[in-house]
């Protein structure tokens, strides 16, 4: 049983690999792909070495920092009251009155700082320092929700609703849905 080949053994470099003169298009395509692969590899190595240089200078990306060093940002109303605000209230509908601590807790909103802590051994930037404030809690007892309380690793500052806009339609950092 002999096989009939269209090509002679002189037309092939090895079994299944045609010579350059018979399959020049395939060899050209292989050459282009190889050159593009080498260019991509050179660009990747260049970016990697620049990234390492920046990391050594303390200016690198945030991926190497712990969660405690990267502040969160958002409306932290849930941490004060234990429930998410469902409907926005405007100032015309709800004029300020002497509602006591419960009223103050509902009016106060918390926001975190967007500034990173300076790297150890470096001089802090001239930006605004993180302000620490007390959070006012309402005097009503909170219903115990099943499960642990959410943890938040950020410093916060209480602000009134007039000072910052609230975002009632969005979920925020470490917020949990209100119990039904």
Swiss-Prot record:
Expressed in thymus and spleen, with highest levels in immature thymocytes (at protein level). Keywords: Adaptive immunity, Cell membrane, Disulfide bond, Glycoprotein, Immunity, Membrane, Phosphoprotein, Signal-anchor, Transmembrane, Transmembrane helix. This is Signaling threshold-regulating transmembrane adapter 1. Homodimer; disulfide-linked. When phosphorylated, interacts with PTPN11/SHP2, GRB2 and CSK. The lineage of its organism: Eukaryota, Metazoa, Chordata, Craniata, Vertebrata. The modification Phosphoserine is found at residues 63, 66, 85, 90, 166. Residues 81-103 are annotated as: Disordered. Residues 73-76, 172-175 are annotated as: Interaction with GRB2. Phosphorylated on tyrosines upon TCR activation; which leads to the recruitment of PTPN11, GRB2 and CSK. Glycans are attached at residue 6. One of its GO terms (biological process) is signal transduction. The gene is Sit1. The chain crosses the membrane at residues 25-45. Negatively regulates T-cell antigen receptor (TCR)-mediated signaling. Involved in positive selection of T-cells. Disruption phenotype: Mice are viable and fertile, with normal growth and no obvious abnormalities. They show normal B-cell development and peripheral B-cell functions, but have mildly altered thymic development probably due to enhanced TCR signaling. This results in a greater susceptibility to autoimmune diseases. It is found in: Cell membrane.
